[in-house]
């Protein structure tokens, strides 16, 4: 049976993916004054960075050590593919366009988040004492 933490993380990850899909199905919002294209790209990086962190945290609850140890890489790959499908999806939404530069910033955000998760996880696992019952 999954732990409560795992259920919450997976639920949050799927809910966030749904929010991304719904947001990209809506007409293009008017940008806030002063944000311009730089703010838009930063939001893409932030959006997919957060998605990657949620994915990595959820994947790290999987009990398979091969999957668990690759949580950051798997999360990055899934987030990048989701970003690609999101941009393709927007080509079918009136008043929206699929933008390859948006996808690039989705990938940048996902890569930074995956790297940060990997570094954090490496440091936490080195600092944690190894018990005699834990698998090596």
Residue map of PLM features:
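"…centered on the first transmembrane helix and the immediately adjacent amphipathic helix/loop
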Residues: 1-58
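Lipid-exposed faces of alpha-helical membrane segments in multi-pass integral membrane proteins
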Residues: 8-22, 46, 77-81, 85, ...
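Short helix-capping/hinge motifs at transmembrane helix termini and TM-loop junctions
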Residues: 26-27, 60, 94, 121
């Amino acid at each position: 049976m999954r732990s409560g933490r795992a259920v919450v993380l997976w639920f949050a990850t799927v809910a966030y993916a749904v929010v991304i899909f719904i947001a990209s199905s809506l007409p293009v919002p008017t940008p806030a004054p002063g944000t311009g294209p730089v703010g838009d790209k930063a939001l893409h990086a932030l959006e997919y960075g957060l998605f990657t962190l949620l994915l990595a945290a959820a994947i790290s609850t999987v009990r398979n050590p091969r999957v668990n140890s690759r949580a950051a890489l798997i999360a990055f790959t899934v987030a990048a593919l989701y970003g690609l499908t999101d941009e393709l999806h927007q080509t079918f939404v009136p008043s929206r366009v699929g933008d390859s530069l948006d996808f690039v910033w989705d990938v940048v955000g996902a890569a930074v988040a995956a790297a940060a998760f990997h570094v954090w996880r490496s440091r936490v696992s080195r600092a944690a004492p190894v018990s005699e019952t834990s698998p090596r």
